[in-house]
Structures are given as C-alpha cells and as structure tokens.
Design a protein with these regions (language model features):
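Active-site nucleophile-adjacent alpha helix/oxyanion-hole segment immediately C-terminal to the catalytic cysteine
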Residues: 2-121
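Surface-exposed loop/turn and secondary-structure junction residues enriched for glycine/proline
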Residues: 56-59, 88, 158, 188, ...
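Residue-level detector of short, conserved catalytic/binding motifs and their immediate flanks
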Residues: 62, 176, 207
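Helix N-cap and loop-to-helix transition residues
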Residues: 63, 81-82, 96, 161, ...
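Predominantly the structural core of cysteine protease catalytic domains
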Residues: 100-203, 252-255
C-alpha cells in the first residue's frame, strides 16, 4: 500500500490482520486498553441496553460525517449544532475521518480510530472521489492525525472483520462512526439497495452503527441520508460496504 504516513507514531498500534481475524476479542482488548486508562470515562460492560440514538439527517451531500457527530453529541446531551461542528472542522466541505476525530477531541469526547492507514493513502488518487483534492488536503490530514496522537487518541492500524465489531458492540457500550461505500448500503428491513452499485464509482459515506441485534442477526445503524430512523444490515453486508478501496476501513469507536 502506497501511503504518506505520520512521523509521530508513538500512539499507533499495529496488528496483523490475520491475528484480528482469528480472535473476535482482539478489538475489544485494544479498546479496553485504550479507554480503561481514563477512570473518569466509566468504561463498562454492555448490559444489553441499546443507546437511545436520536436520528439526524444530513443537510447537504457532503455532511454525513457531521450528522454522525451530532448523533454522538446528542447521546451525551451535548446540543452541538451543524454550524458549530462545521466551524470545528474548519468550515471545509471535504471531510476525512480525522476531521471527525478532531471535533470529538475539541469537545472532550473520548474515542479511538481504527484504520488500515494512519495517514494519507496515496492509492486513493486513482479514485475519482479523491483525485481532485487529495494532494491539497494531505498536509492538513497529516497535521490532524498528529494532533490526535499527541493528545492521547488511540489509533489502531489494522484490518478487522465484522465479527470483531459485532463482539465489541455486544460486550462494550460503544457506537461506531463508520466510513462505507455508499453504493453498498443495504437495509434488510426494507429489502432494497439504498444506492445503485453500478451507477458510479466509489462514494464515501458515514453511518452511525449503534449496536448489534441478536434476534435479527444484524447490525443496527443510522444512515444520515435516510428519513428512516433505524436500518439493519447483516454481517456480510457490514463487511461488503466497508472493506472496499476508498474507505481505509475507517471506524471511529466512541464509548457512551
């Protein structure tokens, strides 16, 4: 993988994918290590109560990540507005996962980043979704990664299967802000694809995953582009929409 990486990588954990894939608990152990260091956080077991996520719709084509941040803020009774989030992002319209981390950091919201590239993946230049602006944004993205790391945000640089995230959601009180290919989102409740897979190339989109429903055997998520309050996707669909070139398998893990 061609990538522009960080200079300061003291807080970046690197795990081989095979290790993560074989042990469903490996991600949970990483999160335990990341969050138990903060006794004020109250990092605790999932007692079977799903979080009361208030659905937020995005306002424009590019602000799905901001809508996910607002849903997280509402979980914490933080009345953060779109305007305030946009200002914390620097009033830009090209949002990377590390911009979302920056907002959470500025609001003192504990979180960790899971990604296959803690930096700028130059392979993304081949995708039309990125190619017009990746060079101009590279320095800003690297600066924000370093800021997050220097402020103690844990970054785990590894690939994980959906089984790892299923186990984490069932055993720990967390929500996930997840970068997906918008073409691959499929809600099992309505039974149809949200977007046409063949209509265009990769289209990055953020969704908020609030838990795993064992009765339905599906992840529960909020799509900011949809009026529907909750959607569901199977383990297979979960991986199909995120394990694609363009996402770097980015997930922001936020305890609540």
């Amino acid at each position: 993988m061609a990538a522009t990486l960080l200079y300061n990588r003291n807080n970046v954990s690197q795990l081989p994918f095979d290790t993560a894939a074989m042990d469903p608990q490996v991600l949970q152990k990483e999160m335990d290590d990341a969050f138990q260091a903060d006794p004020a956080l109250g990092w605790c077991l999932n007692r079977g109560t799903a979080p009361n996520v208030k659905h937020v719709r995005q306002c424009r084509s590019w602000d799905c990540g901001l809508a996910c941040i607002q849903m997280v803020a509402r979980l914490r009774n933080d009345a953060l507005t779109f305007k305030e989030i946009s200002k914390l992002c620097g009033n830009i319209t090209s949002i990377w996962t590390v911009h979302l981390s920056s907002v959470l950091l500025q609001r003192n919201i504990a979180h960790a980043i899971v990604t296959t590239c803690a930096g700028v993946n130059q392979d993304l230049e081949s995708l039309s979704f990125y190619q017009d602006h990746i060079e101009q944004e590279k320095n800003d993205v690297l600066r924000l990664f370093n800021t997050s790391i220097n402020n103690g945000i844990r970054i785990i640089e590894s690939g994980y299967s959906g089984v790892n995230f299923k186990h984490l959601l069932l055993t720990r009180r967390v929500v996930l802000i997840m970068l997906v290919d918008n073409r691959g989102l499929r809600c099992t409740d309505c039974g149809c694809m949200k977007r046409n897979w063949f209509s265009c190339g990769f289209t990055g989109h953020y969704v908020l995953v609030q838990g795993y429903d064992e009765e339905r055997e599906a992840f529960v998520y909020h799509d900011p582009a949809d009026r529907v309050q909750k959607c569901w996707m199977t383990l297979l669909q979960f991986d199909q929409c995120r394990l694609v070139k363009g996402t770097d398998e980015d997930v922001v893990v936020v305890p609540y």
